[in-house]
Amino acid sequence: MILFPSVDELLKHIDSRYSLVMLASKRANELDAGAAPLLEHYDSSKSVGKALEEILAGKVTIDPDHTEDLQD
């Protein structure tokens, strides 16, 4: 269970829980593959937590022109 960032706060940035999970998963995979971090400091040590922090900060968003990519 995640305590920070809260799901309610994250859902202010992403329209559904499904989209939130898919976006966080894709970003976590990118971080694991060596993608550059988008924040200077993270509270979480795990890639999924870092991805959620980036979403909360508005650094990672869903491109409305590529929403079908989330279903892959």
From Swiss-Prot:
EC number: 2.7.7.6
Keywords, in A-Z order: DNA-directed RNA polymerase, Nucleotidyltransferase, Transcription, Transferase
One example GO MF annotation: DNA binding
GO annotations of cellular component type: DNA-directed RNA polymerase complex
Keyword Transferase: yes
Recorded catalytic activity of this chain's protein: RNA(n) + a ribonucleoside 5'-triphosphate = RNA(n+1) + diphosphate
Gene3D superfamilies: 3.90.940.10
Keyword Transcription: yes
Listed GO biological process terms: DNA-templated transcription
Subunit structure: The RNAP catalytic core consists of 2 alpha, 1 beta, 1 beta' and 1 omega subunit. When a sigma factor is associated with the core the holoenzyme is formed, which can initiate transcription.
NCBIfam families per record: rpoZ
Protein purpose: Promotes RNA polymerase assembly. Latches the N- and C-terminal regions of the beta' subunit thereby facilitating its interaction with the beta and alpha subunits.
Similarity section: Belongs to the RNA polymerase subunit omega family.
Protein name: DNA-directed RNA polymerase subunit omega
